[in-house]
Structure formats: structure tokens, C-alpha cells
Amino acid sequence: MDSSAGKSKSGFVENRSIDFIPENERHGSIFAQFTLWFGANLQITAIVTGALAVVLGGDVFWSIIGLFIGQCFGAAVMALHAAQGPKLGLPQMISSRVQFGVYGACIPIILVCLMYIGFTATGEVLAGKAIAHLAQVSNTTGILIYACFIIIFAAIGYRLIHWVGKVASVIGLIAFVIILTQILALSNISELLAVRHFSWSSFLLAVSLSASWQISFGPYVADYSRYLPTKTSSTRVFWAVGLGSLIGSQISMMLGVFIAQVSNGGFVGNEVQYVVGMNPIALVITFLYFSIAFGKVTLSTLNAYGSFMCIATIWNSFKPSAQISKLTRLTIVLAMVIISTFIAVVGEHTFLSAFKSFILFLLTFFIPWSAINLVDYYFISKGLCCTNLSVKA
């Protein structure tokens, strides 16, 4: 357990870990929830996810429709998880002890850790390429530089993560306008949308890609709403998180669909270079490389922070009296980033095929977990608050 009870909420570096957040330390706003998830989804991996719908056989029109349907379903699910945060005041996965028990919850938590590592590794591949071009270094060096930023941001914690989310929202919007403008200059969008060859397999793949993208946030979305005051409206949290994630990811995935269609195969294997190379202006190219790297930092930091929460929860299951210090946080984050960095370096050249398999695997696991958690919370426990749920369960 963390021994930081009673510490001031004013510090920028987070003191707490998996313990309950008391009312006098609650802070934050509904708008910050929107900007965090909006910014976290305006990034290159979401663009690649959208592009997969076309790369794997879909057309522009039905891919966009399928992606949007999946977004709506998935965002609703993840937003229902987010609404638990202010009421429980605990990280998302520790609440799984209600459904699975103290030791049983370790099984889904371990799988969530694998998800964090996988998503961080894919982010490092793409952001590492962007940093490599900015700094004129090798891709491997770019990945290592990016990994250092993840470690620093995740070690500092909650407040910095929300600040990064706000900045990423602004940078991501500017990058979106630039890329969309270039797409409009290179092709006729109405002509792209007019080519339609519907097939159930391609359509359902698009739905699955976006739904699994959104649902994969479920295991840690409440980690970033748990500091909100207990009386915060669950409905407002639901809409802020859900709309932020839905709008941000749909923008990115729609861009991915258009880019994959106009690239004539040039996007595959050259995702970062192709997106940036669509614009001929050197200053704009530099900004786009920066926006790709910074946009990925938000989500990768969420993953590293979430991995700390999960591993601390497992540790607490077997050693309830153990102290979780800032050094422990740093050590856990460092270990997770080292593993993901190794995977990123080794798997850099097989990125797209591995990413497709990875994101669809998430769907097969997280839908059952999410269904169990939500049914229990909203229909059986009926919004169980933390006064009835100790960290020791």
C-alpha cells in the first residue's frame, strides 16, 4: 500500500498509487477528460488503424461507415468504465477484485499489462521514426529517445499526463488540418467516396478494428477520472470521455482511410514517411514529424502509467503491507518501457501485420472482461463506492 495518505494535492509530482483518493485531494474538470482522450486519439497509430480497413480490402465509403459504427459502440463501453472513476476513487483494474477476487483479478491484470506493452511497442516504432527524422539519427536511436520521454512523463504522473493531453489536442488538430488540406489537394474526396464495393468481411473488419481500439481503453480509462470529486456527474464524465475518444479517433482513422486509398500501396511499410511526405514545405514537414512524436507520447504515457497501476495491484495482492514509493513507480515504469522498447526494435519491420493481429486479439479478450465488469457495477453492485471496497478487498 502507498503511505502517502494525507499528503497535499498541490504537488505536480503524483504521490499516490493504487490507494483510494480522499475527497480533499480530488481535483480536475470534465473538460480535461475530453481533451485527454481527444488528444490521445489524434495520433499516428489511430491513422494506421483506419488505413488497415482499406489496406485489407475495404473501400473508402464503407470503411468510414464501419469504423464509425465501431467507434460508437466501443466509445460507449469505455465511457461507462470512465464513469466509475470518481465514484470508486481507485484505478480501474483494482475494481476487478469485486468480480474476480483478489487473486483471480491478477489474471486479467496480467493480460492488460501485455496490452500496455504491445501498444507502447507499436507507438515506439512510429514515433521513433518521426524522432529519427527530426534528430537525423537511426530509427533505433529515435525509439530510445522516445522511450526516455515516456519514462519521465509516467514517473511524474497524473497532472502532467492531463497537461500533455491538452497540448496534444491542439497540436493534433493543427496537424489534422494540414494533412486533410494536402489530401484535398492531391485527390477528389467525392470521387473516392463514390467508389463502393461493399463486402461483409471488409465492413465487419472495419467495425472490429475501431471497436477494439476503443474497448482496449476500458481497463485503464477510470485511472484518469478517479481524481474527480465524488459528486461529479457520471453522465457528464460519460459524454466527455466518450465524445473525446470517439471524435479524436474517428478523425484519425478517417484520415488513415483516405491516405491508404490515395497512396496506391505506398503507405504500407512507410507509414510515417508517407504521411509527412504528402506536404512539400520543409517547415510543415518538421512540424508533422514533431506532432507524430508528441501525439504518441500521450497514449504511450497512459500505457506506462497504467502498467504501473496494474503491477502495483498484483504486488499488493500478495504483499498488502508493501510500500509503493516513487522509486517503485519509476522502477516498474522503467521495466515496462525496456520490454516494449526491445519488442519495438526487434519487430519494427513487421509492424502492420503484427499490429492487425494484436488489436483484434484485444477484442477477443476485453469484450468478456468489460461485459462482466459493467454488468456487475451497474446492475449488481449498482455503483458500489469505495467506502464499501477497500484496496485489500
Regions flagged by a language model, labelled:
Residues I314-H349, A393:
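Loop-to-transmembrane helix boundary motifs in multi-pass membrane proteins
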Residues G66-F100, I107-M115, T298:
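Juxtamembrane transmembrane-helix boundary signature
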Residues G128, T141-I183, H197-F198, W239-G242, ...:
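Membrane-interface loop-to-helix entry segments
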Residues W369-A393:
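C-terminal membrane-solvent junction of multi-pass transporters and transport-like membrane proteins
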Residues A105-Q136, A293-I314:
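Hydrophobic transmembrane alpha-helices that form the core helical bundles
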Residues T45-G57, A83-G85, A121-A130, I152-L160, ...:
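Transmembrane helix-loop junctions in multi-pass membrane proteins
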Residues Q43-A46, I69-V77, V112-A121, I171-Q182, ...:
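Selective recognition of specific alpha-helical transmembrane segments in multi-pass small-molecule
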Residues M1-V60, S202-S208, R226-R236:
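Membrane-interface "cap" regions at the ends of multi-pass membrane proteins
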